[in-house]
């Protein structure tokens, strides 16, 4: 009886170590995007956006974002990346995740959010960095909204620089940089 009770207590402690609260207690993860335009450091909010943060970190740890591009850039709005290579070939993402846009985080300048289609729960690998306050993307403004899951803590000048590069259309894609802006690597910082 004592052995089974001790085993149950140990299991509860082990499972609690994986909870969002336990992750937050360790400190929110920081991710470094090394790009052809400079470095951008992100701080992710695992307490308010645990699904989006886990999804993003899983892509980072798998190397998925390495050698992808910021394939859509719009001055005064945002820079979007995480899905295409330099030839505008889309990488195969993991299944979509739940939209966490109702988490209270807002699409303000310097935040990072999940990109998606018209289907509210369609976000996979693509993300965008807001280079302006974009309240119309927040939960309930016009639809469910776009889930913010972190913010830029270093390198906002790099994001601003990327947002100003010349763009053109490539096939069906608009606002594509004429010279690719490449995410050379993405890594979780210790």
From Swiss-Prot:
GO terms for biological process: protein folding. It is found in: Periplasm. Keywords: Isomerase, Periplasm, Rotamase, Signal. Its EC number is 5.2.1.8. One of its GO terms (cellular component) is periplasmic space. SUPFAM superfamilies: Cyclophilin-like. Its main location: periplasm. InterPro entries: Cyclophilin-like_dom_sf, Cyclophilin-type_PPIase_CS, Cyclophilin-type_PPIase_dom, E_coli_cyclophilin_A-like. GO terms for molecular function: peptidyl-prolyl cis-trans isomerase activity. Pfam families: Pro_isomerase. It comes from the Bacteria. Residues 1-24 form the signal peptide. It is an enzyme of class 5 (isomerase). It catalyses: [protein]-peptidylproline (omega=180) = [protein]-peptidylproline (omega=0). Residues 27-188 form the PPIase cyclophilin-type domain. PPIases accelerate the folding of proteins. It catalyzes the cis-trans isomerization of proline imidic peptide bonds in oligopeptides. Belongs to the cyclophilin-type PPIase family. This is Peptidyl-prolyl cis-trans isomerase A.
